[in-house]
Structure formats: C-alpha cells, structure tokens
C-alpha cells in the first residue's frame, strides 16, 4: 500500500512538473483537484482532432514488457508527453468486462458488466462519436477484432447484452461513421431486421463503399467506407496479420483528415489493439508481445500524424488489465548480474488494476493524475466538443 502511494505521488509530481514546464501553470496549480474542476490554460491551442487508442487488456506490465523487449526509449509509449492512471470498475463489479469499460470510455457513464452502450436501466447512453457526428465531424473506428465486438460497439451501438452481435451489426449498418475497418463479415452479411436486408446491402444503398480485402485499403481516398476483412476476428499476429493495423490507422487518418478539412471541422478516430486481450486471456506471453508491438506501430502512426497536424490530441489507454501479468526476476539475488526475467500470469481473466493513460499532442497537459475512466471520457468530450457544456457539469 505504501509503495502504491509513493508511485502515484511520483506520477502526479512528474505531471505537475511537465505542466509547469510547458506553460500549463493553471493545470499544475489545480492538479490536486478532480479533473472535473480543471480549467484549461488560456494560451493552449484548442483540440481539434482526437485519436483515441485503446489497448484491450493492456496494463502497465504489458507496456513494460514491450519496453523491456524493444529497448527503453524506442517505443511510441516513450514519446508520451503526459501520463495518468484510471480506475476501471463497472457499475456492478470491481472487475470490469470490456463492454462496461468500453461504454465508460465511449459514453462517460458506468454500466453493468455485459451491457453495451446503455445505462444500468438499459437506457441508451450516447457516445462521444454520436456527439461528434451531431457536430458535423467525421468519425471512425479501426480494430483487429470484429467491428461488432465490445469496444468498437460501445461507440455506436446500444444493446443490453454485448453478445447480441447481429443486433449490434444491424446498428452498425445504420450508423453515420465515416470509416470503420475490422472483422465481422459474417454478421454484416446477415440481418435480424424485419425486412431481412443484410447490413452490407444497406450500407451500399446508403452510399458506403464496402471492402472485404485489406489490399483494397490502398485504393481509398475518401469515405464513407466500411471494411470487413474477416468473418470473425482478424488473424493473430503469429498467423500473418502483418501491418494491417498500422496501415488501416494511417488510411483512416488520411480519409478523416481530408473530410474534416472539407467540413471545416475536426475528427475523432478510435483505434483498438483488440487482440492484446485475447492473447493475455490465453496467458500467451509471446502472443501478447507480438500484439503490443503491432499496437505500438499504430500508436506511432497516430503520434506522427499529430506532429504534422497541430490541434491533434493522441490518447492511449486501456479498458482494463487482462491476465494479472507480472515480470519477476529469474534470480532472487539482485546483487549479481541479471539472470533474466520471466513473464507470469496470475489469471486467465481480467483484474481490477488501474491502467495507464499516455497523452501526446495538443491538450496533453490538461489530463493527469489519478482519475476514473468516466472522468477521462468527460474530459475528452469537453476538450474536443467544448460547446457541449462545462466540464464541471456534463450530465449527458
């Protein structure tokens, strides 16, 4: 407990030092307050674009694994300009699932495990994507799971149970996302609607281009477009998925940036490293590392975009930690030369551990300290959509 308090205190002090160093004095002075009480520095650029990267199941140990294996200072995570920690509990369980956590990150509201895009009473909870669409902003999602899975679904769907994949898919086909890349073709080719019209046909009727092969990404220049690149989830990295996530992220950014410019608006893109979680459920350390390396390349693509486009905020976080991953020494005698390290999992499920938030780009100094996942979501809405209400009172 004492060590935990020391670590948290160090994180807060580092965040304060960074905020003062870049001129975000107002943030530093109020750092001991809840994020809902923080006012932005007047000399900071407004946040126009949000790139929201979610490593499903990614805890601090998963990031540490990447850094240890890649060499400190070489990963996209090392480029972070600010950091925070978030709690992940759901409305009915201290250990969340991806549906409840995704709903919190997308909508600013807690819900029960298994519930997606709805409040505990099953009332629809509007996501930041829906808010952005109403404001005329292009939006998109890029994942390595099915597009109907919990995290992406939280940004556009409303169902009482996360495994209602066909119902979620039917809602996807009726959504106003500008770009969506992932798996889930088998659901897009079917329907539970009374008219029986498959989602793919509905999308085409609505003017969407529909892709089924990742090689078609190179042919794109604008949306609306949805790509369903596998019947279910895309393959594991070990099974040849290649650089799909990075390529799809870069293509989505290209399309959204162009359309945002034409509309004189910003954009929001959510990118998920979906299969970090799946490999951690399997307690597959090599698989986790491969998925983390893949996600790291997508994070780097987002940061590179932010470097070229002032007004872009990159937020990298997780919905929860999976596997209870620890990294002990292979030798308990630390006074001798290192004998190596080990990667050990304590569970095949999720844990209640806090997860990290890495921030980069415009507005990165405004979020720091220890907060809840819903508070992070409220801050992001306020930064990207300031006309939606004061951060101290955002009830919607």
PLM regions and their residue ranges:
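Active-site His/acidic residue clusters
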Residues: 150-155, 232-240, 257-266, 270-298
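Positively charged n-region of N-terminal signal peptides that target proteins for export
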Residues: 3-6
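Metal-dependent active-site segment of extracytoplasmic phospho-/sulfohydrolases and closely related
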Residues: 60, 293-334
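N-terminal catalytic scaffold of extracellular/periplasmic and nuclease hydrolases
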Residues: 21-217, 223, 321-396
């Amino acid at each position: 407990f004492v060590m935990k308090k020391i670590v948290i205190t160090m994180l807060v002090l580092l965040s304060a030092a960074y905020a003062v160093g870049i001129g975000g004095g107002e943030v530093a002075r109020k750092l001991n307050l809840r994020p809902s009480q923080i006012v932005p520095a007047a000399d900071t650029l407004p946040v126009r674009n949000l790139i929201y990267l979610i490593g499903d199941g990614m805890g601090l140990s998963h990031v540490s694994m990447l850094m240890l294996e890649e060499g400190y200072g070489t990963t996209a995570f090392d480029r972070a300009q600010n950091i925070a920690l978030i709690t992940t509990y759901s409305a009915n369980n201290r250990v969340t699932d991806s549906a409840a956590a995704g709903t919190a990150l997308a909508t600013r509201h807690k819900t029960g495990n298994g519930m997606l895009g709805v409040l505990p009473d099953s009332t629809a909870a509007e996501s930041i994507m829906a808010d952005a669409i109403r404001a005329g902003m292009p939006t998109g999602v890029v994942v390595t799971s099915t597009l109907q899975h919990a995290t992406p679904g939280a940004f556009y769907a409303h169902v009482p149970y996360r495994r209602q994949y066909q119902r979620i898919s039917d809602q996807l086909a009726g959504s106003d996302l500008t770009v969506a890349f992932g798996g889930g073709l088998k659901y897009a080719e079917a329907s539970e609607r009374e008219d029986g019209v498959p989602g793919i046909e509905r999308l085409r009727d609505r003017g969407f281009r529909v892709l089924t092969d990742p090689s078609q990404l190179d042919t794109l220049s604008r949306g609306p477009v949805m790509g369903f690149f596998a019947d279910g989830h895309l393959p594991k990295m070990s099974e040849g998925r290649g650089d799909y996530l990075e390529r799809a992220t870069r293509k989505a950014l290209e399309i959204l940036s162009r359309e945002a410019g034409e509309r004189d608006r910003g954009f929001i893109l959510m990118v998920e490293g979906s299969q970090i979680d799946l490999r951690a459920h399997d307690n597959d350390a090599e698989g986790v590392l491969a998925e983390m390396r893949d996600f790291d390349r997508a994070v780097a693509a987002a940061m590179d975009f932010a470097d070229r486009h002032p007004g872009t905020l990159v937020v990298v976080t997780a919905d929860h930690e999976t596997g209870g991953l620890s990294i002990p020494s292979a030798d308990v005698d630390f006074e001798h030369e290192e004998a190596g390290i080990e990667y050990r999992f304590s569970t095949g499920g999720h844990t209640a551990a806090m997860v990290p938030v890495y921030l980069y780009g415009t507005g990165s100094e405004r979020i720091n300290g220890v907060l809840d996942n819903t508070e992070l979501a409220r801050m992001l809405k306020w930064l990207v959509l300031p006309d939606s209400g004061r951060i101290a009172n955002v009830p919607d």
